[in-house]
UniProtKB/Swiss-Prot annotation:
Residues 30-108 are periplasmic. SMART domains: AAA. SUPFAM superfamilies: FtsH protease domain-like (SSF140990), P-loop containing nucleoside triphosphate hydrolases (SSF52540). CDD domains: RecA-like_FtsH (cd19501). Its main location: membrane. The gene is ftsH1. Residues 1-8, 130-619 are cytoplasmic. GO terms for molecular function: ATP binding; ATP hydrolysis activity; ATP-dependent peptidase activity; metalloendopeptidase activity; zinc ion binding. InterPro entries: AAA+_ATPase, AAA_lid_3, ATPase_AAA_core, ATPase_AAA_CS, FtsH, P-loop_NTPase, Peptidase_M41, Peptidase_M41-like. This is ATP-dependent zinc metalloprotease FtsH 1. It is a multi-pass membrane protein. The active site is at E427. It is found in: Cell inner membrane. Its EC number is 3.4.24.-.
């Protein structure tokens, strides 16, 4: 219905513009329709007595030609000579005693109307179009004031259930209680309980906050109003507050109901800030109205406000006080079991081969959120489709993980034989040092295939399980493995290359962390010499030093000393396994990629061969 009215409502505007244009053009045509004759020809006609009358205007002279057998009476125009007062044409007219009429510049009535009307019409048309765009076709002359909230309709949409949400069990438990309250409010009220008026979902992007809200809508079987907070704020001051009032009025009429506002930090930012210049009238009016609506909830009204944000630190304290958003639900990054459960949910929609290990995929994706894992499953499905398979295998998940974490294969990357050999020794060094250290994570795969992120090779280690704590021995093992590539280059080829710069940077940062923050310094003892400021949950971290310059110099010296020790340890481990280093590097040059089982087999064969031959005899 709205789509049919929209062209009709604009038709009158088009007709009006056409009419004004016709008026303007008609005036121009009437004034400019008479022929223009050359100046000298007009003077000659006057002197021959062929002109009966003249009308003198500021910029031209209109001449009336006498009627003759050859032609009827007609009017012609002559452009006056600029800057000449007593011009020849005027003198000729006076000499021939032609009737002369002077006319001041006048515009026709219709032209004047058109000149006044056209700007007004254009301004009103522009304002009307802005109002229509602000309202996006909402009905009525003030339709743009109405709320843009979308009402969830279970009959038209595929409902999301709590069974479709995995990896965030604690947050899901909180929301299950909300759904239960909406279904049976009397059970809580009989004991004097009051459900929180507002629930704020807090978590990094992609963790499933909006999905949880949709699951609440699917389970509660009550009207569910959802919109983004940015839809409140428009260019007209006061429009956001009006939409807030409209939204909550609709929710109260439909109670019990749920209102969900996504990205609430768009209107809920702290007021004031940097002074008067930081004030945004429209956003603050919207926030004030939102606070007033939260305060206006009747205890007997079963309207629950849910909101989501990934920036809780910028929200106004008045929004978070008890009685408003008095329950905050943390939707954090999933742990190992949570990631495996999320992968299982997404894997329901794709055909999996029997040998696929989702637990291995979960171990290879620490720190990933639900959106990342959904992308991994989709990339695996695309990889299987590219090779023409009917099922998704483990190799497809490996390819998806590599594309996500390492980038695409660089098929056009051409390395010389010497560079290829050096990369093979480098990755073999990482892998063999990891095999030699009991506290190091197992090696899942080694590859010298170049990737688009700039890596010429990669050694992938997958932890056996996900731990919350790490020991000093485990940190030292990680650093030693990082330095194993550089040590292998020096041992096998006699000199190092720039390929180890990233390993060295990460190793240095990890050792500095041990010395300054973890209390693992040998020289400085138990002291935290740096602190982290920022929002750890959102990954916004900065390190602030809390020690003197002299202590900082000691920190630098200890970092260099311990890095040197671990480098020598990595080098000695490779000296003891020199045959294995050569064998693994040769296998990488030939095959490009070795799985963990192949790596262990090559290393074991080399070790058995060395034991059988025995150490070299002394001269």
């Amino acid at each position: 219905m709205a789509d049919e009215k929209r062209p009709a409502s604009r038709a009158w505007l088009g007709y009006l513009l056409i009419a004004v244009g016709i008026l303007v053009l008609s005036g121009i045509v009437r004034s400019r329709g008479r022929p223009l004759v050359p100046y000298d020809e007009a003077v000659a006609e006057v002197r021959r007595g062929e002109i009966s009358a003249a009308i003198v205007k500021p910029d031209e002279i209109e001449l009336v030609r006498r009627e003759s057998p050859q032609r009827p009476e007609e009017r012609v125009r002559v452009t006056r000579l600029p800057g000449v007062e007593d011009e020849p044409l005027v003198r000729a007219l006076l000499d021939k005693q032609v009737r002369i009429e002077a006319k001041s510049p006048q515009t026709s009535v219709w032209m004047q109307v058109a000149i006044w009307m056209l700007p007004l019409v254009l301004i009103n048309a522009a304002f009307f179009m802005m109002l229509r765009r602000a309202g996006q076709g909402a009905g009525g002359p003030l339709g743009f004031l109405r709320s843009k909230a979308k009402i969830y309709d279970r009959s038209r949409q595929d409902p999301v259930r709590f069974s479709d949400v995995a990896g965030v069990d604690e947050a899901k438990d909180e929301l299950v209680e909300v759904v239960d309250f909406l279904k049976e409010p009397s059970r809580y009220r009989s004991l004097g309980g009051r459900i929180p008026r507002g629930l704020l979902l807090i978590g990094p992007p992609g963790t499933g906050k909006t999905l949880l809200a949709r699951a609440v809508a699917g389970e509660a079987n009550v009207p569910f109003f959802s919109l983004n907070a940015s839809e409140f704020v428009e260019m007209f001051v006061g429009l956001g507050a009006a939409r807030v009032r409209e939204l909550f009025e609709e929710a109260r009429k439909s109670a019990p109901s749920i209102v969900f506002i996504d990205e609430i930090d768009a209107v809920g930012r702290t007021r004031g800030g940097l002074g008067a210049l930081a004030t945004h009238d429209e956003r603050e009016q919207t926030l004030h109205q939102l606070l007033a609506e939260l305060d206006g909830f009747d205890a007997r009204t079963t309207v629950i406000l849910m909101a989501a944000t990934n920036r809780p630190e910028v929200l106004d304290p008045a929004l978070l006080r008890p009685g408003r958003f008095d329950r905050q639900v943390i939707v954090d990054r999933p742990d190992l079991r949570g990631r495996e459960a999320i992968l299982a949910v997404h894997a329901r929609r794709v055909p999996l081969a029997s040998g696929v290990d989702l637990g291995l995929v979960a171990r290879r994706t620490p720190g990933m959120v639900g959106a990342d894992l959904a992308k991994i499953v989709n990339e695996a499905a695309l990889a299987g489709a590219r090779r023409g398979a009917r099922e998704i295998g483990q190799a497809d998940f490996d390819e998806a993980l590599d594309r996500s974490q390492l980038g695409l294969r660089r098929r056009g990357q051409i390395m010389t034989a010497e560079e290829r050999r050096r990369v093979a020794y480098h990755e073999a060094g990482h892998a063999l040092v990891a095999l030699a250290l009991p506290a190091a994570d197992p090696v899942e795969r080694v590859s010298i295939v170049a990737r688009t992120i700039g890596a010429l090779g990669v050694t992938i280690q997958v932890p056996r399980d996900e731990r919350q704590l790490v020991t000093e021995q485990e940190i030292e093992s990680r650093v030693t493995v990082m330095l194993g590539g550089r040590a292998a280059e020096e041992l096998a080829l006699g000199q190092v290359s720039s390929g180890a710069h990233d390993d060295l940077g990460r190793a240095t940062a990890l050792v500095r962390e041990m010395v300054t923050r973890l209390g693992m310094s040998r020289r400085l003892g138990l002291a935290a010499l740096a602190r982290t400021v920022g929002a750890p949950m959102l990954g916004v971290l900065q390190e602030e030093r809390t020690c003197s310059e002299a202590t900082a110099r000691e920190v630098d010296e200890e970092v260099r000393e311990r890095l040197g020790e671990m480098y020598l340890k990595a080098k000695q481990l490779l000296v003891d396994r020199r045959e294995g280093l050569e064998a693994v590097a040769e296998a990488l040059v030939l095959k490009e990629t070795l799985r963990g089982e192949e790596l262990e087999e090559i290393a074991a064969v080399s070790t058995r061969r060395k034991i059988a031959v025995g150490p070299p005899s002394a001269a």
